[in-house]
């Protein structure tokens, strides 16, 4: 079946808000056998939305609209779809009471315009929004499926997973089974990856390299008329890539580097402290984004200046004078001293030049110290100041992951 996603809102067209809804929905629809061939972004203009929706009716089987279900005058999605399908909007009393209860629970007064959100196209099903006021809507008309979802990503995902996805699985006629996964790589470029994977050919399978900043993700796709065959093909493809790229693979699908590091520390019963110069606390910030990190991450110090390195972490003056403040030796001193300061099993130290001035912009040194020895990573990263710092964080976390897996 052919799918289409229509995203509604001036804020999307004008670039104020990143449209993550379309990405999420495309991934989800692919998994259940709906091939998304079209995406449109339409502003808060009634005639434009009617025209866009009419076009989608002529070419797509499943049409999902996001946004424009709010209480204000520029929220026009229901009105535009109802005009195209020649449906009246009727007050749904149950939905009206749910919206009133939502405000009562928050101890807030419901505005009169929120009543607008309880109007539903005649014959449509309500997709209950458990975390917001805008309900989703599900319409079957002849051979078309039309769904409307709230715009806020958290609400959209909740309504899709709880309400819309089960209906789609029940109602659609899949033209086969699609399976996909993602393999995540660090330390190898897209062109190098392409050289390695170009000889891997499995019928009805596809590998799509996606170059990200300092990483490459491989999107794997498998198709078959039989679900088990689709899964087996995908597994075979994953195994082949694991064999060829094992030294660069750090994760799969929804894995996050910081979560892998924290969970591995937990599994091994180890503790960590970090001393950062160039990255200014970004590594510590990433680690503390993970729930339960306090069990293994004891703390960090940003020793940005030479004085801070000397006074906060008692780095040797001789080391700084002989090797400079950006060097393997200074990073080792930071790692060693932070480990002692926080009495942890592992210490990590990082120094570098984030730029934009200087001859060695992008150079960084990360040293990891533990009871089993030390590990050193040095790279020169491209990009501006922010990109370099983010890249150093990713590379350092990956080096820590490798240190823990040794």
UniProtKB/Swiss-Prot annotation:
Transmembrane segments: none annotated. Belongs to the CinA family. This is Putative competence-damage inducible protein. SMART domains: MoCF_biosynth.
């Amino acid at each position: 079946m052919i799918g289409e996603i229509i995203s509604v809102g001036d804020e999307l067209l004008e670039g104020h808000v990143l449209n993550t809804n379309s990405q999420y929905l495309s991934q989800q629809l692919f998994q259940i056998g709906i091939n998304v061939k079209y995406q449109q972004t339409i502003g808060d203009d009634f005639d434009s939305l009617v025209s866009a929706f009419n076009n989608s009716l002529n070419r797509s089987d499943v049409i999902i609209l996001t946004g424009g279900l709010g209480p204000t005058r520029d929220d026009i999605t229901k009105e535009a779809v109802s005009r195209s399908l020649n449906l009246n909007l009727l007050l749904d009393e149950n939905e009206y009471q749910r919206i009133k209860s939502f405000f009562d629970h928050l101890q807030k007064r419901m505005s009169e315009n929120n009543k607008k959100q309880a109007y539903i196209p005649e014959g449509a099903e309500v997709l209950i929004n458990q975390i917001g006021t805008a309900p989703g809507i599900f319409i079957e008309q002849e051979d078309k499926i039309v769904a409307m979802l709230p715009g806020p990503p958290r609400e959209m995902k909740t309504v899709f997973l709880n309400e819309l996805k089960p209906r789609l699985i029940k109602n659609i006629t899949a033209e086969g089974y699609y399976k996909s996964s993602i393999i995540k790589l660090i330390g190898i470029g897209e062109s190098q990856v392409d050289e390695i994977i170009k000889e891997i050919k499995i019928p009805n399978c596809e590998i799509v390299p996606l170059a990200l900043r300092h990483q490459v993700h491989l999107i794997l796709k498998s198709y078959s008329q039989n679900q088990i065959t689709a899964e087996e093909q995908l597994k075979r493809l994953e195994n082949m890539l694991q064999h060829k790229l094992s030294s660069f693979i750090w994760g799969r699908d929804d894995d996050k580097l910081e979560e892998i590091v924290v969970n591995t520390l937990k599994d091994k019963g180890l503790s960590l402290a970090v001393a950062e110069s160039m990255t200014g606390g970004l590594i510590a910030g990433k680690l503390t984004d993970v729930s339960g990190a306090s069990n293994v991450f004891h703390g960090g110090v940003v020793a940005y200046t030479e004085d801070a390195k000397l006074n906060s972490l008692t780095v040797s003056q001789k080391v700084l004078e002989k090797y400079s403040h950006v060097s393997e030796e200074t990073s080792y001193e930071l790692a060693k001293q932070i480990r002692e300061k926080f009495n942890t099993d592992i210490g990590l130290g990082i120094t570098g030049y984030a730029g934009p001035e200087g001859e060695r912009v992008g150079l960084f040194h990360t040293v990891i110290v533990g009871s089993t020895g030390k590990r050193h990573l040095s790279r020169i990263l491209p990009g501006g100041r922010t990109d370099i710092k983010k890249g150093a964080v990713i590379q350092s976390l990956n080096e820590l992951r490798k240190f823990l897996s040794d």
